[in-house]
Amino acid sequence: MARYAVEKSTHTGGAFSDLVFVDDRTPAASVYDVPVLQLADLEPGDFYCLAVGDGKTRSDLAARCDAAGLRPYSLLAPTFIAGPGVDIADGAVFCDHSIVTTSARIGRHFQCNIYSYVAHDCVIGDFVTFAPKVACNGNVHVEDFAYIGTGALLKQGRSDAPLRIGKGAIVGMGAVVTKDVPAGAVVIGNPARTR
């Protein structure tokens, strides 16, 4: 994700004068020819975008950045498509060819990898991660910190009974989810079952 953020940084419309990585644990002077700084080197009001796949780690880092007075920045790839009525919270990352169709709510620091989509009337929580090629059909509610693996398929819910993926749940690669997934559960297979 970090490399992707660097490669797509040229599509920010010239909004930024400097692009840096922030990592208090990395002794390297640069990564991908981009300077590496420590959090203390940044100024209140600077923007940040978290390039970390794990939602809990992203949450911890966001809390540190927010406490330092930094502002979350959403990174939208040039091929990202958002339909009408889409509400995207701060800090989201949408990679190339990702789509949110219509009337969906996207939580803080959501990461949507390449070729993933979120269909109509979905609610995606904070710090959720979609790996590449996730198919999230309409009327699905994904709670905070859930991780949806590559190629997973989330069945269409109903407006009166959305399909629910519980807080912190993990949906394995290629899983076909046809029923609600409880909070903290790990599901795999077709149809998806608790591991």
Set out the residue ranges of the language-model regions:
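Solenoidal tandem-repeat scaffolds enriched in leucines and small polar residues
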Residues: 178-180
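Short amphipathic alpha-helical segments
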Residues: 2-7, 60-64, 106, 182-183
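A structural motif detector for beta-strand N-caps
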Residues: 74, 80, 86, 90-98, ...
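A solvent-exposed beta-alpha-beta segment
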Residues: 1-55
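Short alpha-helical
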Residues: 56-57, 87
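Intrinsically disordered, low-complexity Ser/Thr- and acidic-rich flexible linkers and loops
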Residues: 156-164
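Conserved beta-strand-loop-alpha-helix hinge in the C-terminal portion
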Residues: 184-187, 191-195
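Glycine/small-residue-rich loop that forms an oxyanion/phosphate-binding "nest" at active or ligand-binding sites
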Residues: 50, 58-75
